[in-house]
UniProtKB/Swiss-Prot annotation:
Induction: Up-regulated in response to denervation-induced skeletal muscle atrophy. Induced by MYOD1. Keywords: Acetylation, Nucleus, Phosphoprotein. This is PSME3-interacting protein. The modification Phosphoserine is found at residues 17, 222, 228. Residues 22-53, 154-198 are annotated as: Disordered. Residues 201-254 are annotated as: Interaction with PSME3. It comes from the Eukaryota. The modification N-acetylmethionine is found at residue 1. One of its GO terms (biological process) is negative regulation of protein binding. Phosphorylation by CK2 stabilizes the interaction with PSME3.
């Protein structure tokens, strides 16, 4: 009996009586009167009938909440505009940066001007030193040129006699006072016809420079000795032997 009563109770709870429906409708009307606006109807609208099961309705609510959560944390929804305080702060920071950059540029310009002025001073001093060096070197060069020209002045090339090997030499213009003191150089002669060992012939120290007026001419005995300032002898091997003594003696060659 008890089991049957319980089953009947469960079955009864699955159905709603008309009295319960009227009571619910009355409570809903009272609530509607509290929130109703003048343009709203006087009677409370009936509840919409939903034929879906409870599972489907709960799943719908769950999906709706998930969509709201995702929409809240989307990137486009995370971006927001700046307020007035933030914009003022950013403006102040940018202004400070511009001042610092301007000061740095001014310091660089000052350093460049100072460097250029120092460079110009150094360049002018270096140019002055170079000019002074050139002025100091020019007199020395001119002096050397004059001394070389003076040394080369009066140098005359003479051609020796053709009695032996041709020899060319440079000889300054002789001075009449020094001509008597010059040592004549020996030149090559023909092969000696004299028999015996070769000998060295030294011309006489007394060389005739000129004839003074009022003096007679001497005999030609010494003409062979003073005919040339470059006389000499050749030994048996054909080697030129220079005169070393200004005398009339003959020295035997080794």
């Amino acid at each position: 009996m008890d089991g049957e009563d319980d089953s009947n109770l469960v079955i009864k709870k699955r159905f709603v009586s008309e009295a319960e429906l009227d009571e619910r409708r009355k409570r809903r009307q009272e609530e509607w009167e509290k929130v109703r606006k003048p343009e709203d109807p006087k009677e409370c609208p009936e509840e919409a009938y939903d034929p879906r099961s409870l599972y489907e309705r709960l799943q719908e609510q769950k999906d709706r909440k998930q969509q709201e959560y995702e929409e809240q944390f989307k990137f486009k929804n995370m971006v927001r505009g700046l307020d007035e305080d933030e914009t003022n702060f950013l403006d102040e920071v940018s202004r400070q940066q511009e001042l610092i950059e301007k000061q740095r540029r001014e310091e660089e310009l000052e350093e460049l001007k100072e460097y250029r002025s120092n460079l110009n001073k150094v360049g002018i001093s270096a140019e002055n030193k170079e000019v002074e060096k050139k002025l100091a070197v020019k007199p020395i060069e001119t002096k050397n040129k004059f001394s070389q020209a003076k040394l080369l002045a009066g140098a005359v090339k003479h051609k020796s006699s053709e009695s032996g090997n041709s020899v060319k030499r440079l000889k300054p213009d002789p001075d009449p006072d020094d001509k008597a003191q010059e040592a004549p150089s020996c030149m090559s002669l023909g092969s000696s016809s004299l028999s015996g060992p070769p000998s060295i012939h030294c011309p006489s120290a007394a060389v005739c420079i000129g004839i003074l007026p009022g003096l007679g001419a001497y005999s030609g005995s010494s003409d062979s000795e003073s005919s040339s300032d470059s006389e000499g002898t050749i030994n048996a091997t054909g080697k030129i032997v220079s005169s070393i003594f200004r005398t009339n003696t003959f020295l035997e060659a080794p």
